C-alpha cells in the first residue's frame, strides 16, 4: 500500500449525505476499511470524493477524513447545482449556482477539504445516465474529472453514488459511472499519459 501513487482504491459510499453512519455496499468494508487503508498510507494520503451536485457532498465523511484521519480530502461536484430548487429565495439557474458554489466553498473552510467542479451544467432532473449524457458531452466531462485527478493526485476515490439506476437521478448515476471509467487507466491518468 505504500506504493499507492499509482494505486487507487475505489469505494462507493452510497446515498449522499449519510456516508459515515450508513451501510456500505457489500465487500467494501465501508468507513472502517477506509480508515484502515488510510493508516497504512502513512503521512501523505489524499482522498477525492465525487458527487453530482453541491448538496450531494458527504460533509461528515469529509470532516472525518481531513480533521479526524489526517488525510488531504477534496470534493468534486460535477455541477454547481444550477438546476436545483430554491425554497428560500428567488434565485434560480446561474444565480442559484453561484449561491450553491459559495455554500460549498464555505463548507470547505469548515471541514478542511478542497473543492473542485467540472464544467457540467445542472440542467435539472434526469431519469437516466444516458439522458444526462445527452446534455453533457461525455468526453468533456471525462476530461474535467481527469484534470482534477491529475491535479489532486488522490490515492483513494470515493463515489457518493453507485453509477446504477438505484441512484435515481441520472446525474447521480453519471457521478458513479465516472469512478468506473478511471479504474483501469488510472496509473496513466495520474502520470498525465494515456488517451484521456
What are these regions (language model features)?
Residues 188-196:
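Active-site cores that bind ATP or allylic diphosphates and position pyrophosphate for catalysis
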Amino acid at each position: 500500500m505504500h506504493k499507492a501513487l499509482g494505486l487507487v482504491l475505489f469505494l462507493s459510499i452510497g446515498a449522499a449525505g449519510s456516508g459515515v453512519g450508513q451501510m456500505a455496499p457489500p465487500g467494501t468494508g465501508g468507513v472502517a476499511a477506509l480508515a484502515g487503508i488510510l493508516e497504512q498510507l502513512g503521512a501523505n494520503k489524499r482522498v477525492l470524493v465525487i458527487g453530482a451536485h453541491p448538496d450531494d457532498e458527504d460533509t461528515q465523511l469529509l470532516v472525518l477524513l481531513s480533521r479526524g484521519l489526517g488525510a488531504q480530502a477534496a470534493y468534486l461536484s460535477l455541477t454547481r447545482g444550477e438546476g436545483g430548487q430554491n425554497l428560500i429565495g428567488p434565485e434560480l439557474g446561474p444565480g442559484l449556482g453561484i449561491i450553491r458554489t459559495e455554500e460549498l466553498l464555505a463548507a470547505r473552510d469548515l471541514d478542511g477539504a478542497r473543492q473542485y467542479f467540472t464544467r457540467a451544467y445542472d440542467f435539472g432532473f434526469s431519469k437516466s445516465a444516458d439522458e444526462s449524457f445527452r446534455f453533457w458531452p461525455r468526453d468533456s466531462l471525462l476530461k474535467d474529472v481527469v484534470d482534477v485527478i491529475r491535479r489532486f493526485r488522490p490515492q483513494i476515490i470515493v463515489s457518493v453514488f453507485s453509477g446504477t439506476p438505484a441512484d435515481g437521478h441520472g446525474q447521480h448515476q453519471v457521478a458513479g459511472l465516472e469512478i468506473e471509467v478511471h479504474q483501469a487507466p488510472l496509473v496513466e491518468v495520474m502520470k498525465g499519459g494515456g488517451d484521456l
